[in-house]
């Protein structure tokens, strides 16, 4: 099991838990919209660090982005396994061809 899979399992386990017991439970209790907002905030912070060129800060912000992405997915009952399946289906396909095939 990868660290992302363990993180996704932990996030899933926080659903329905007392919001005062964990940050993840609190985010999930606030609903998908709040989870999406937090994901967006963290993505912007990662972008800022990418522009600044601070590798350590970028790695830290990227970790926050991944965490908040998993929380946002969980808030809408989309599993990490589902996302990984989409990526696996796209593997080996040109990005241009894959994008054209969506239309």
UniProtKB/Swiss-Prot annotation:
<keyword id="KW-0368">Histidine biosynthesis</keyword>
<keyword id="KW-0028">Amino-acid biosynthesis</keyword>
<keyword id="KW-0547">Nucleotide-binding</keyword>
<dbReference type="Pfam" id="PF01503">
    <property type="entry name" value="PRA-PH"/>
</dbReference>
<dbReference type="GO" id="GO:0004636">
    <property type="term" value="F:phosphoribosyl-ATP diphosphatase activity"/>
</dbReference>
<dbReference type="InterPro" id="IPR021130">
    <property type="entry name" value="PRib-ATP_PPHydrolase-like"/>
</dbReference>
<keyword id="KW-0963">Cytoplasm</keyword>
<dbReference type="GO" id="GO:0005737">
    <property type="term" value="C:cytoplasm"/>
</dbReference>
<keyword id="KW-0378">Hydrolase</keyword>
<dbReference type="GO" id="GO:0000105">
    <property type="term" value="P:L-histidine biosynthetic process"/>
</dbReference>
<keyword id="KW-0067">ATP-binding</keyword>
<comment type="similarity">
    <text>Belongs to the PRA-PH family.</text>
</comment>
<protein>
    <recommendedName>
        <fullName>Phosphoribosyl-ATP pyrophosphatase</fullName>
        <ecNumber>3.6.1.31</ecNumber>
    </recommendedName>
</protein>
<comment type="pathway">
    <text>Amino-acid biosynthesis; L-histidine biosynthesis; L-histidine from 5-phospho-alpha-D-ribose 1-diphosphate: step 2/9.</text>
</comment>
<dbReference type="GO" id="GO:0005524">
    <property type="term" value="F:ATP binding"/>
</dbReference>
<dbReference type="InterPro" id="IPR008179">
    <property type="entry name" value="HisE"/>
</dbReference>
């Amino acid at each position: 099991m990868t660290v992302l899979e363990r993180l996704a399992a932990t996030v899933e386990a926080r659903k329905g838990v007392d919001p005062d017991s964990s940050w993840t439970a609190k985010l999930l209790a606030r609903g998908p919209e709040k989870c999406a907002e937090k994901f967006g905030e963290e993505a912007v912070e990662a972008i800022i660090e990418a522009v600044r060129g601070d590798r350590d800060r970028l790695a830290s912000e990227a970790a926050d982005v991944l965490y908040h992405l998993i929380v946002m997915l969980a808030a809408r009952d989309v599993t990490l396994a589902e996302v990984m399946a989409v990526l696996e289906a796209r593997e080996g396909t040109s990005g241009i061809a894959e994008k054209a095939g969506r239309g």
